[in-house]
Each structure stands twice: as structure tokens, then as C-alpha cells.
Amino acid sequence: NLYQFGNMIQCTIPGSNPLL
């Protein structure tokens, strides 16, 4: 789950990562 990592990079969608 990339929720925590996504949150660090200002990801508004749980489990979603802009870098991916």
C-alpha cells in the first residue's frame, strides 16, 4: 500500500501514487 508514501508527496487519493 502506497498510502503513506503517496500522502508524503501530496497524494489526495488513498493508495495512489502520481509517480507511478
From Swiss-Prot:
Q: Does the keyword Lipid metabolism feature in the UniProt annotation? A: yes
Q: Name one GO cellular component term.
A: extracellular region
Biological processes per GO annotation: lipid catabolic process
The protein's name: Phospholipase A2 D5
Q: Name one GO molecular function term.
A: phospholipase A2 activity
Provide the family line.
Belongs to the phospholipase A2 family. Group I subfamily.
UniProt keyword annotation of Disulfide bond present: yes
